[in-house]
């Protein structure tokens, strides 16, 4: 029954203290919150912490959610972004790279290694971008939000978000070239 209710209906029920209404929200959106936090932080452990903290904030602030101003997912993304950026600004916050398993057969293993190298170049370049540019790319390209949704999550006008995204893409391309050159020398 609860699984069929909209996110907004579930938040309203959670705001009135219904803990059972909160579980489907977590089930639906925890993975997305973790992915967004990891795209910003580059650290799986911290991303898990941020996602959990975000849902704690959602629970504590459910009564302040206004479905007329934004969808639940946009509100959640804004909370995750704010928490991740705050965490990034803390001294000693460094991205931690993850080690993936390499496939056993040689052609697949080689393709996997090449793909890993390319991903590492993009990841390194991404973490060299200013945090707002990184957030714009993460929301639009990794999370698949529309320009309007991403703009709302970042508290920007659509036009300002589009401009930020264009600058972010240009900067990312430049950083990818620079990282590739550094690795080749």
Could you tell me what each predicted segment is?
Residues 15-16, 42-43, 55-69, 90-91:
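Sigma70-family region 2
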Residues 26-44, 61, 77, 126, ...:
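Amphipathic, Lys/Arg- and hydrophobic-enriched alpha-helical face
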Residues 4-7, 86, 92-119, 146:
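Internal acidic/polar
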Residues 60-67, 78-97, 115, 176-178:
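Arg/Lys-rich amphipathic alpha helix in sigma70-family domain 2
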Residues 123-135, 139, 143-160:
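Helix-turn-helix DNA-binding module
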Residues 2-3, 115, 124, 152-155, ...:
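C-terminal edge and immediately downstream basic/flexible tail or linker adjoining helix-turn-helix-like DNA-binding
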Residues 1-2, 15-24, 34-53, 158, ...:
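Short, charged helix-capping/linker segments at alpha-helix termini
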Residues 49-56, 70-82:
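Structural recognition of an alpha-helix C-terminal capping motif at a helix-to-coil junction
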């Amino acid at each position: 029954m609860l699984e069929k209710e909209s996110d907004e209906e579930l938040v309203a029920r959670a705001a009135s203290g219904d803990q059972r209404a909160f579980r489907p929200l977590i089930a639906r959106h925890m993975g997305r919150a973790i992915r967004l936090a990891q795209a910003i932080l580059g650290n799986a452990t911290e991303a898990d912490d941020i996602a959990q903290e975000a849902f704690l904030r959602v629970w504590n602030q459910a009564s302040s959610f206004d479905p007329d101003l934004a969808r639940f997912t946009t509100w959640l993304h804004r909370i995750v972004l704010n928490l991740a950026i705050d965490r990034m600004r803390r001294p000693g916050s460094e991205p931690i790279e993850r080690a993936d398993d390499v496939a056993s057969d040689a052609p697949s293993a080689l393709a996997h290694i090449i793909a890993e190298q390319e991903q590492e170049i993009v990841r390194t370049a991404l973490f060299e971008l200013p945090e707002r540019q990184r957030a714009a790319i993460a929301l639009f390209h990794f999370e698949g939000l529309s320009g309007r949704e991403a703009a709302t999550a970042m508290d920007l006008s659509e036009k300002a978000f589009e401009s930020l995204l264009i600058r972010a893409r240009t900067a990312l391309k430049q950083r990818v070239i620079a990282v590739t050159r550094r690795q080749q020398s």
